[in-house]
C-alpha cells in the first residue's frame, strides 16, 4: 500500500501558526509532557493549550499526527456514494475541535476529490472550550482557504464546555441548518476521563448530537486513540448506541451485532494508517522515544440511515498478517464474530500475503479446520478496498 505523504503546503500552514520550533529538545520535552497527559500518566488538564510551550508542541507534533486519521473514515463514508457531496454546500461541525485538526483534515481531503465530486462550498463550525485553540483553528483554516479559492470555506468558532452547556449550544449551532458531518475526534476519551459518570456522558453527547445536529442523510465520525482502553471504550459505546436504535454503523463494522472484540479482555479493533512522518515528527520521535511510524486509531462512522448489507463472503481484516512457521494467519471480522483464517505457505497466494489491517476482502472458499478456518482448494481472495493513502 502506498504511504500517506503529509502535504507540504499543510506543513507550511501549520508552521506559520506554530512559529519557529526553536530548540528541538525543548519542543520534544513539551511533546513528552503532552504524551504523558494524553495516555493518563499525569492528571488530566483540559487547559493545556493555554501554555505556549504545549500549544507549540501540539501544533508541531500532534496536529500532523492526528490530521490524517479523519480521512480514512471519510473515505469509508464516501465509498458507498462517491458523489455524496458533489456540487452542493457541505456543512460540518467538530465537537471539541482543538486547533481545527479534524476540520483541516476534512477540507484537505475534500480538495483531493475529483472536481466533479467536490462540494461547491464548505461551512464549518468548531466548538471548543479553549480560546487559544479556536484562535489557532481560525488562523489555520483562513490560511488554507486562501490557497483553495475554488472551494470557498466559512468557519464559525463557538467557545463552550460541551458536557455542561450543549443544551443551549446545539440549537444555536444548527440555526443555519443541520450538518452533513458531525466530527468527534479524540473527544470522548477526554469526557470519560474528565467527568463523573464519564462513560454515560460520552454516550449521551453523541446521542444528543444525532438528535439536535445531524441531518437525516448525514454521518457522525468518531475517532479515538488506538490504545486498548480507549478503543475498547469505543466498542462499548458502539454497542450501546446500536442497541438504542437511533444510529447505525457504516464503518469499520460490517454488522450490528455486539462487538466481538469485547468477547475477551485482550482484544481491541483499530485502524493502522501507513505514512511518511514529516521530518519534525520523526525528529521528535527520535528525541522522545515516541513511535509514530504508522498512525493507529479507533473509529466509527455512524448514521441515522442503515447501510447496505455486506455479502456473506465479505470480511474486514482486523489484524496484521501473522507470519508463522509454515503458514500465515490473519484475523477477520463479519457477522458478529472474529475468525482466524490460515493459509499454508506452500499454497500461498499474493492476495493473502498482501492483506493489511482495515482491508475489506472477498473470500470464496473457506473451510473450518478445528478452531480456525483454512482456504480450500481453488479459493479466491480479493481485496475490495485498501485503507486510503495519499
Could you say what each language-model-derived stretch is?
Residues 1-45:
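N-terminal auxiliary segments of SAM/dcSAM-dependent transferases
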Residues 44-82:
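Class I SAM-dependent methyltransferase Rossmann-like catalytic core
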Residues 99-117:
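Conserved SAM-binding loop of SAM-dependent methyltransferases across substrates and taxa
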Residues 135-173:
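S-adenosyl-L-methionine
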Residues 179-199:
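A short SAM/SAH-binding and catalytic strip from SAM-dependent methyltransferases
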Residues 200-217:
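A short glycine-rich, Lys/Arg-flanked "PGG" loop and its adjoining helix->strand segment in the class I
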Residues 216-224:
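Conserved beta-strand signature within the Rossmann-like core of class I S-adenosyl-L-methionine
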Residues 279-390:
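C-terminal lobe and adjacent flexible extensions of AdoMet/dcAdoMet transferase-like proteins
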Amino acid at each position: 500500500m502506498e504511504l500517506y505523504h503529509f502535504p507540504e503546503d499543510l506543513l507550511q500552514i501549520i508552521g506559520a501558526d506554530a512559529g519557529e520550533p526553536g530548540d528541538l529538545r525543548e519542543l520534544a520535552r513539551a511533546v513528552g509532557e503532552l504524551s504523558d497527559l494524553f495516555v493518563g500518566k499525569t492528571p488530566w488538564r483540559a487547559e493545556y493549550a493555554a501554555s505556549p510551550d504545549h500549544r507549540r508542541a501540539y501544533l508541531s507534533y500532534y496536529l500532523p499526527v492526528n490530521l490524517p486519521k479523519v480521512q480514512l473514515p471519510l473515505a469509508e463514508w464516501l465509498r458507498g456514494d462517491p458523489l455524496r457531496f458533489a456540487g452542493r454546500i457541505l456543512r460540518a461541525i467538530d465537537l471539541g475541535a482543538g486547533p481545527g485538526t479534524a476540520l483541516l483534515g476534512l477540507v484537505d481531503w475534500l480538495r483531493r476529490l475529483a472536481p466533479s465530486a467536490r462540494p461547491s462550498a464548505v461551512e464549518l463550525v468548531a466548538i471548543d472550550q479553549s480560546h487559544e485553540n479556536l484562535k489557532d483553528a481560525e488562523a489555520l483554516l483562513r490560511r488554507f482557504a486562501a490557497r483553495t479559492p475554488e472551494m470557498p470555506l466559512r468557519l464559525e468558532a463557538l467557545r463552550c464546555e460541551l458536557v455542561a452547556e450543549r443544551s443551549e449550544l446545539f440549537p444555536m449551532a444548527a440555526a443555519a441548518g443541520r450538518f452533513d458531518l458531525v466530527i468527534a475526534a479524540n473527544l470522548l476519551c477526554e469526557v470519560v476521563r474528565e467527568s463523573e459518570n464519564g462513560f454515560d456522558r460520552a454516550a449521551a453527547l453523541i446521542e444528543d448530537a444525532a438528535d439536535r445536529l445531524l441531518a437525516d442523510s448525514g454521518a457522525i465520525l468518531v475517532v479515538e486513540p488506538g490504545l486498548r482502553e480507549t478503543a475498547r471504550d469505543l466498542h462499548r459505546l458502539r454497542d450501546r448506541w446500536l442497541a438504542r436504535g437511533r444510529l447505525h454503523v457504516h464503518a469499520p463494522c460490517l454488522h450490528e451485532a455486539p462487538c466481538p472484540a469485547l468477547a475477551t479482555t485482550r482484544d481491541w479493533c483499530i485502524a493502522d494508517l501507513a505514512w511518511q512522518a514529516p521530518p519534525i515528527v520523526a525528529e521528535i520521535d527520535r528525541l522522545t522515544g515516541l513511535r509514530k511510524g504508522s498512525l493507529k486509531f479507533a473509529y466509527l462512522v455512524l448514521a441515522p440511515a442503515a447501510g447496505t448489507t455486506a455479502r456473506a463472503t465479505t470480511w474486514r481484516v482486523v489484524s496484521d498478517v501473522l507470519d508463522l512457521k509454515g503458514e500465515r494467519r490473519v484475523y477477520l471480522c463479519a457477522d458478529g464474530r472474529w475468525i482466524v483464517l490460515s493459509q499454508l505457505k506452500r499454497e500461498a497466494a499474493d492476495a493473502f500475503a498482501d492483506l493489511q489491517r482495515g482491508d475489506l476482502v472477498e473470500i470464496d472458499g473457506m473451510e473450518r479446520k478445528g478452531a480456525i478456518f483454512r482456504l480450500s482448494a481453488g479459493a479466491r481472495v480479493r481485496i475490495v478496498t485498501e485503507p486510503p493513502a495519499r
